[in-house]
Amino acid sequence: MVLEIFRKPKYVTVRPEKTETTQGNERRDIPEGLWVKCSRCNEILYTKELDKNFKVCHKCNFHFRLNAQERIHMTLDEGSFQERDNELITLNPLNFPDYQEKIQSAQKATELKEAVVTGEGTIGGNPVVIGVMDSHFIMGSMGSVVGEKIARAIERAIEKKLPVVLFSTSGGARMQEGILSLMQMAKTAAALAKLDEAGLLYVAVLTDPTTGGVTASFASLGDIIIAEPGALIGFTGPRVIEQTIRQKLPEGFQRAEFLRKHGMVDMIVNRPQLKDTLANILSLHGTN
């Protein structure tokens, strides 16, 4: 009997009962998308305040990536944009596996037909032909439709005697289209050569990231080349370069600040000042 007493559990199990939560202590779910963390400094940012600041972190000046619609809204005068060549669609000329599904998925996610939006509008009252790439669409890769839309935009600028502003953000040529994708480098460069012969202005704006075939073609051919702070700009990644040359690359290699220091970029402009900077450049070149 005595031994049984000592064998009994020395604890009591308490089962919590469900009680009605008082109104004051009720849990309130925070809506998704209300806050966002800065990728550079980890600051928690209020989305509405971030949008007011052109999607630039107020603490470390990190420039978040924009989609094409956001870029157009921030750059062009309100109500002035007229889109062109939106009817062009991408095919699968090489019958690359799952390419069509990838295109459809990107179209659904971005509400775009391709990785670039082109058209006409005004910046500070200055008429301009504009092209804006979107890295959210298959990483802004350049396929046949992207190259065609940019070439047509440049040709339209020549016809109407207007300056061209192209915003670049891309992972390079689109591998699913093979040589047809690489051909767009020559096509866009040739169109810009005609623009130059016509004596018209081309301003290239390089945003994060601008790499591969886009860097090796129209992105680097501007009469004036502007970059956003911290933008990654280059042909291939630093790891590949280090493995090839067997040397350690300098700090900040392929970033906008490094390229500005070494003469590859004319100026670095913070996003909130970018529209005014473009308007001043266009006015100085007599486009108004």
From Swiss-Prot:
Domain CoA carboxyltransferase N-terminal residue range list: 34-288
Superkingdom of the source species: Bacteria
Pfam families: Carboxyl_trans, Zn_ribbon_ACC
Keywords: ATP-binding, Cytoplasm, Fatty acid biosynthesis, Fatty acid metabolism, Lipid biosynthesis, Lipid metabolism, Metal-binding, Nucleotide-binding, Transferase, Zinc, Zinc-finger
Known EC number: 2.1.3.15
Cofactor note: Binds 1 zinc ion per subunit.
Localization per record: Cytoplasm
ZnF bounds (C4-type): 38-60
Group of enzyme by EC: transferase
Reaction(s) catalysed by this chain's protein: N(6)-carboxybiotinyl-L-lysyl-[protein] + acetyl-CoA = N(6)-biotinyl-L-lysyl-[protein] + malonyl-CoA
Main location as per UniProt: cytoplasm
Gene Ontology cellular component terms for the protein in this record: acetyl-CoA carboxylase complex
Keyword Protease part of the UniProt annotation: no
Residues reported in the UniProt entry to bind Zn(2+): C38, C41, C57, C60
Molecular function as annotated in GO: acetyl-CoA carboxylase activity; ATP binding; carboxyl- or carbamoyltransferase activity; zinc ion binding
Pathway entry: Lipid metabolism; malonyl-CoA biosynthesis; malonyl-CoA from acetyl-CoA: step 1/1
GO biological process: fatty acid biosynthetic process; malonyl-CoA biosynthetic process
Cofactor(s) required for function per UniProt: Zn(2+)
Task performed by this protein: Component of the acetyl coenzyme A carboxylase (ACC) complex. Biotin carboxylase (BC) catalyzes the carboxylation of biotin on its carrier protein (BCCP) and then the CO(2) group is transferred by the transcarboxylase to acetyl-CoA to form malonyl-CoA.
Subunit details: Acetyl-CoA carboxylase is a heterohexamer composed of biotin carboxyl carrier protein (AccB), biotin carboxylase (AccC) and two subunits each of ACCase subunit alpha (AccA) and ACCase subunit beta (AccD).
Family under the similarity heading: Belongs to the AccD/PCCB family.
Name of the featured protein: Acetyl-coenzyme A carboxylase carboxyl transferase subunit beta
